Amino acid sequence: MRGVIGKLNWASREGMPQGAGDASLLASKMPTPTVEDLTEANAAMRRLIANDVPIWIRAIPFEDLSLVVFDDASLANTKGGFAQIGHIVCACEKKIHTGQRSPVSVLLYKSHKNPRSASSTLLNEATGKSEALADSEWVATWIGLCKDLEYDMRKRHLLNREIKIVSLTTNHDNDGLDLASITDAKSLFDNLMQQQYTGAEKRAALEICVIRDSLESLGGRVRWVPHDRNPADCLTKLRKR
């Protein structure tokens, strides 16, 4: 089991984001895995071997460069009842903001257990999005340094606005998920779209303020996409064998 998980971790870390969720979730089963866990690990390894997906880095002019980030959070599916959160940060062309198709380059991805004990799915979703935007700010700052040697990181909240990031979230359907997951996922989107935090717990409301601040510093906005169209979904749950 340790050997299989080690291979999964190495492959996903070096350039196979489709296996990052499996690797992280299976690693949380140690040091007391079950036979079912071993079966899941072997199935995950077979999927990676059978699906060799290249990561393309597209040539996008600096003046047309933008970012898009996909994020997702699960509910109590890791050891100890913690949530799994994950995100993918991609480079794209600015025309994606107007609904047009755009070439996309995966720059950064991450899947891990939520280190915070969250009392609601809304807080899990908010924590995942906040972390995704933090990595997006890091990428945007790196791009700013590449474009201008005089880039002042102390003014990144102003200079990064030209990136105009798009942050996408999902509202899960009810296939195998409880009603709370559906409601809270939509609640995050609703709370980001309005000024008042209707029904939001205080910690989640504070995290939403952080998200709004990150979106403002990146000149960004949040959008909603269906569960089955979110590429970050595979980062937060084990796929079926």
Please provide the spans of the model-predicted regions:
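Intrinsically disordered or highly flexible coil/loop and linker segments, enriched in small
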Residues: 10-21, 32-36, 50-54, 76-84, ...
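Contiguous, well-ordered alpha-helical segments that form the cores/surfaces of helical PPI scaffolds
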Residues: 3-13, 21-28, 69, 75, ...
